[in-house]
A protein has these predicted regions:
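A general structural detector for well-ordered alpha-helical segments in enzyme core domains, enriched
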Residues: 128-135, 184-187, 238-242
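Surface-exposed cleft-lining segments at the edges of enzyme active sites
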Residues: 114-124, 172-173, 223-232
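Conserved, mostly hydrophobic/aromatic
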Residues: 66, 114, 146, 188, ...
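Active-site beta-loop-alpha junctions enriched in small/polar residues
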Residues: 117-119, 149-151, 174-178, 201-203, ...
């Protein structure tokens, strides 16, 4: 086998090893939390937060960000079809499941991402959504992170008792490029949610949201490059520009990963290892803690839960340099970042 050739900044053509890449004033090294350690290793958990609730699986592609969907890629690796949409059997009631001691598996105060292998507002899921809303209604002590590319469907899908919104729902729209930001953020603003954010992932084109941040409704912005099959490049200049807009508005900004193809100072880098991507994102110094987000969580009786009774995220040493550290719900001890 021919040896790999070493390029500038320590990268090898065709493979990435734990060597340094200089991004601005910060040195980036390999390392941390991955979906898989190489292109063909599949992880069961797809998460930058502590846990995930997938009440249904499968989706229909609807915009540019869907082109190289990670769920389709992972399903294909399992000889499954990502376009087949079905209600999950054991996972549907997950937020209500208890351990052997009778306590909820998901603790009060945790933040759970919903439908990470689908879209919560998918038309095909209409028959199941009311039951999912009921589960979130029962777990008013847990924050549910909703992310959609279909904000135009949301108002018609809200439960009858929604009112001005539930405090335990954090609603986000995907803005993979400027076209989708200009299309979806105005719809986001028109919807009755108490907590709103946006996610530029896959980040496949420059996005400016300064005019939208000025409205004061957006509490958090997440961005990250594209991964898996046929990943499109993420440009560090886009990240820096978006971050500055968030800093100016005092809105939390989190750069979770570079993506497989990353461009910095005109140079193109191939980084198939998501551990490396995550650590590089952290070491870039882009993450910014803006105004804190307060979720007023209540117990089964509707009483406020004291702060000392809420889940406290715990982290291990490797977590300290993870790109998602700023917004993560804590280490799940899955052992995959060792």
């Amino acid at each position: 086998m021919q040896p790999h050739r070493k390029g500038q900044n320590g990268f090898l053509f065709g493979v990435v090893i734990p060597v340094a890449l200089n991004l601005g004033s910060t040195t980036l090294v390999s390392g941390l939390r991955s979906y898989y350690n190489n292109r063909y290793r599949i992880e069961r958990r797809v998460s930058f937060l502590h846990d995930i609730w997938n009440p249904w699986h499968g989706c229909v592609k609807c915009s540019e960000g869907c082109q190289n969907c990670y769920m389709y890629f992972l399903d294909r690796m399992r000889d499954q079809n990502g376009a087949e949409i079905y209600k999950t059997k054991n996972g549907f009631s997950y937020p209500l499941q208890k351990d052997r001691t009778g306590h909820y598996k998901i603790q009060s105060g945790e933040q759970i991402r919903v439908c990470m292998t689908s879209d919560f507002f998918l038309e095909e899921a209409d028959p199941w959504r009311a039951e999912a809303w009921d589960i979130m209604r029962q777990r008013s002590d847990v924050v549910f992170f909703l992310l959609t590319k279909r904000p135009q469907r949301v108002r018609a899908c809200l439960p009858p008792d929604w009112g001005n919104g539930w405090d335990n729902i954090f609603f986000n729209v995907t803005c993979e490029n400027q076209r989708r930001a200009d299309e979806r953020i105005p719809l986001l603003f028109d919807l009755p949610f108490k907590h709103k954010g946006i996610m530029c992932a896959p980040f496949i084109g420059p996005v400016s949201i300064r005019q939208y941040l000025a409205a004061g409704q957006i509490e958090q912005v997440i961005c990250g490059g594209e991964n898996y099959d046929g990943a499109r490049p993420c440009n560090f200049d886009w990240v820096k520009s978006l971050r500055q807009e968030c800093v100016d508005a005092n809105v939390t900004f989190c750069f979770i990963e570079t993506g497989t193809v990353f461009i910095k100072d005109g140079k193109r880098y191939h980084l198939p290892n998501k551990q490396l991507q995550s650590r590089m994102a952290y070491k870039s110094g882009m993450n910014f803690q803006g105004k804190s987000i307060r979720f007023d969580l209540v117990d089964d009786w509707g009483y406020p839960i004291p702060q000392e009774n809420l889940y406290v995220p715990h982290f291990r040493a490797n977590c300290e340099t993870c790109g998602s550290r700023l917004i993560c719900n804590g280490c799940s001890n899955c052992g995959k970042c060792l």
